[in-house]
Every structure is written in structure tokens, then in C-alpha cells.
């Protein structure tokens, strides 16, 4: 009985966070897909920095050719942890066509305070590229990381840790991948990164 109550509470929490994190259109899609038995991947909610750190590792581990990251300040401790950087480095060195693209809404903090991801990008600039989100597109308050248009971790508010992670949800990953591509094409290589040789 207690387990049933816990399962119900967990499912309700997932649905509520999904609605909050992904918005009503994508949340409706998730509601339908939650009713079906999953054959691939897993989905869970996060609410702490530590859970976000692990989620980033889990999602990027799913990538074999492309990682797209939309962040406000490179989130110190998340995208510059030794474990995360090792996964990225292993991926780009084993796949000549691998590509890591990072959109940063406010890169000043990352450049000013130093960031190991930026340093790695300097060394592997054939594979890793940073761009500064164009000023009129900085209204996007979310943060997300997409692997191969298949897996993603998504937070509606970049300054909060609540979000949802899915290691196999191509339709939703492609939806946010398309938004990422549009912002990417409209943005430019950040001058401060260019001065660093990135």
C-alpha cells in the first residue's frame, strides 16, 4: 500500500515538473508517452545541483556525434567537472565528425573566473565551439543539454535546478534541437572567446 502511494506521488511529481519544465505543448506529448511502456531510455526529475551534475553526465554519455548546450554562464561545477570533460574529450577524440556546440547567454563570468570547459575548447577548437547568444534572443530563461537529438536534460529556469531528464526522447530532443539551431545561426562567436583563441 505504501509503495503504491509512493509510486503515485512520484508519478504526480514527474507530471508536475514536466508541465513546469517543458511547457504545456511538450508536456502533453510527455503525458501521452508516459502511459506507454518504455522500451528504451529512462526519464526522471531533478531538483538539486548534484542531480543536475549527474544528469549532465548521463545525457552526454548517450552522445556519439553531437552535443548542444544552452547555458547562461557555463554553470560552474556542471559543465567543467573532470568527469564531464573526460566524456567530452573521449567523444571528440574517438569520432572525427563529433561536434560540441555551446550557446552562452552571459559568458563574462565563465571567461573572467576561468572555466575548464573553455580551456578544453581552446585545445580542441576543431570540435568544440562557443557562441554568445544574440542580445535580442537572451529572453530565453531555460537551460538544456541535448545529445544526438535523442537525450536531453531541460530546466525551464536556468537559475533553478528543477528539471527533467530523458535518455531517449527523440521527438522532444529534436524540438529543442531545432530551437537551439535557430539561435545558433543567429548568434556569433563570442569576442572574449575569440581573444582566447577559441
Where are these regions (language model features)?
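PLD/PLD-like phosphodiesterase catalytic module centered on the HKD motif
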Residues: 1-68, 73-198
